[in-house]
Amino acid sequence: QGIRDLTAELSKIAYQEESGRTTKKMINHAISWLQESHIIGYASKAVDCDYKQIKDNSRYYFLDMGIAYYFLSRTGAPYDVMKGLLTENFVYLVLRRRIENTHEIAGLVPWFASYEKIKGELDFYVRSLVDYKNYGIEVKSTDASAKTARKLLEDGKLDYLYLLKGETMGGIADGRIFTVPLCLADRIEFELSKVL
């Protein structure tokens, strides 16, 4: 019954018989409904990894991994693309939970970051409320280079970088880059300046 109600309600919002057109207002109503129903949540964007330049509601994530998998599998996306999107969604949920349950991360929702200088993006950006340092999180289901994240670190926009990967044993590179298995995302710390 719930699924039929959801479909009927979304159809009313997204499609009007009179016009046959989908408008921006209709799409915004549908997104609002999905948010209020706790089906999706949003991430805000930090421009150039600056916690003072935040743009709200910039990216959406599913709040349930099963629903995320279902909808992604219906798109016909290749397995590697689905795997990458699901791993990023998983980390979003971990960060969201930590923001709601602890006082270690700035913001009301997780942030991702853009780097205008090179037109790149960082999967997640964390401003620590413990040591007041900037942390980058790059989520990789495969062994990719994380060029934007490394450039942000090199240019002093980030203090530390976590590379979360699906198939790794973990490790440290140069003292500021940490490779962590994806399954340990909930255990990464945002107080490294106090530890190192």
Listing of model-derived features with the role each one plays in the protein:
Residues 2, 177-178, 191-196:
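Solvent-exposed adhesion/ligand-recognition segments of exported proteins
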Residues 80-81, 136-140:
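Short, glycine/charged-rich beta-strand-loop motifs at protein surfaces that mediate ligand recognition
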Residues 116-124, 187-196:
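Amphipathic, soluble alpha/beta structural segments
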